[in-house]
Amino acid sequence: MSDFLWVEKYRPKKISDCILTEDLKNTFSKFLTQKEIPNLLLSGTAGTGKTTVARALCEELGADYIIINGSDEGRHIDTLRTTIKNFASSVSLDGGSNHKVVIVDEADYMNADSVQPALRNFIETFYKNCRFIFTCNFKNKIIPALHSRCTVIDFRITNGQKVKTATAFLKRLGEILKSENIEYDNRVVAELIQRHYPDFRR
């Protein structure tokens, strides 16, 4: 048995490998072609690939990045200020991108009266050297000042897109199970996907 959780072991490293709708994949592919990303607010239910996409963008662009969990260290404004300031204000030596990236995961858990306004200031202060990618389940919990400074991308999957994305995940999960030498019943796996859809982590 591997020591790694499958969600990490098999996390896609490229946008082309992420299970996304065609519109989303095209949007993120354009950023890669331009070799530039704006500040982003990725919104959608849990397990739809927001953090995976954020990491894949950074990896493919060759950008130095850090991940801050908004439900953990992101709740403490002093820690947040120190972490982001130290990272964003330094010049990247190894990265291939023009900008560093701060990924703020679960940003909707951050205090809307103190922490989120501070992030707005960081976006403006470090714009020349750094970009921010925020992920959230509920974009209505993100203050308007952050909305207006980001390109907002909705990961919501419509009923018309459900079959295609669920089928793609069924295929991916089958490949994972085979690589782990685990026997499985395709119908059972399909039922599990249907039960937890669109949360691909469960």
What are these regions (language model features)?
Residues 1-161, 167-168, 187-191:
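P-loop/Walker A NTP-binding region and its immediately flanking N-terminal helices
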Residues 166-189:
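Helix-loop-helix "sensor" segment of P-loop NTPases
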Residues 178, 193-197:
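Alpha-solenoid HEAT/Armadillo repeat architecture
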Residues 184-186, 196-202:
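The conserved phosphate-sensing helix
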